[in-house]
Amino acid sequence: ALTALSSDLITEYKKDKESRADWEKGYTSGLDLLGFKYNDEGQPFKGASGVTHPLLSEAVTQFQAQAYKELLPPDGPVRTQVVGEASKPKQEQAGRVKEFMNYMLMDKMEEYTPEFDQLLFYLPLAGSAFKKIYYDEIKQRAVSKFVPAEDLVVPYYASDLLDCERITHIIK
């Protein structure tokens, strides 16, 4: 039974990977054009210059900086809003939730900020980026990890992660 299950899993993973082959090719070609990877093959003739313009790299860095400033302000990313009657006890509770969540994200979860920063640099390059948030039994707390789009394999035409048949996270 386990052999059949693993065989099915590998077969379906290969189908999902193949369904996004055009996206992967476009993504790696785009990185090459940005100058993130040197490759001689794309030169029009032997000895041609491989110079790329830094404008796109600068745009990526500007996006990262702006998004970081907006999404991770100095007082933390969590905001709360009271739903329904905004009584004093509810407002105080909302304040405590905000304070605790920001404390967890900015102080206890030491990986949160660098992983989020990496995600923001990657996002404009790939067009998609993901965060995997899970409870770590060893650390006894939630952990938030950046998952690059090339490491998250789903059927290419899936409209959202909640309804897709499979989600495969390639862990390197």
Task: Please provide the spans of the model-predicted regions.
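Extended, helix-rich architectural segments
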Residues: A1-K172
